Amino acid sequence: MAAGPRNSMLLVFALLSLPWPQEVGAFPAMPLSSLFANAVLRAQHLHQLAADTYKDFERAYIPEGQRYSIQNAQAAFCFSETIPAPTGKDEAQQRSDMELLRFSLLLIQSWLGPVQFLSRVFTNSLVFGTSDRVYEKLKDLEEGIQALMRELEDGSPRAGPILKQTYDKFDTNLRSDDALLKNYGLLSCFKKDLHKAETYLRVMKCRRFVESSCAF
């Protein structure tokens, strides 16, 4: 299968290089509105990165004639679909902020292990030679969500449901069709889960701080 366009690969690298509002691990005491704004921005960057990476992998390795049927088969692939998390904005609006934060945290934590193997999936080092930075950005978002949970509960941690299952590692054998389909499915789930986390955070932010950006 043909290699993906260099320009699209450079786009993903550029997204990885985007500055964050705070350095990794930096969540000092700040107003609740700022905590939400920072977490939403981080989630948006990660979701965009996941979406572009999925499209790059698709163009590079998945024949166009097979994409539709494979995408339909992926509908029930993500194990995150087995937890009672809202599937969209309308459902999210029916949940409490703490519920949405817990679901967001579960989704982020489920990818902390798998993303460390992304650099072995793409031979182009410009894309995932910096996969450790993807991991750092996920850890940063995890910390931001935990900061919000502490703030909303006055610093008293509260145990939530634990997602014991995590996603498989990405397969590095790109000469195998089965491995390509597995990686394609994992990237699809990565994109879906980050979209959910972004949606939950935006719903909470808009619910607490009415603003023009609430229309999404």
Swiss-Prot record:
* InterPro entries, alphabetized: 4_helix_cytokine-like_core, Somatotropin, Somatotropin/Prolactin, Somatotropin_CS
Q: Provide the disulphide bond pattern.
A: C78-C189, C206-C214
Phosphoserine sites (modified residues): S131
- Positions that bind Zn(2+): H45, E198
Question: Which residues fall in a coiled-coil region?
Answer: none
**Does the entry feature the keyword Disulfide bond, yes or no?**
yes
What's the stated role of this polypeptide? Plays an important role in growth control. Its major role in stimulating body growth is to stimulate the liver and other tissues to secrete IGF1. It stimulates both the differentiation and proliferation of myoblasts. It also stimulates amino acid uptake and protein synthesis in muscle and other tissues.
| Stated name of the protein | Somatotropin
Q: Which organism is it from?
A: Neovison vison (American mink)
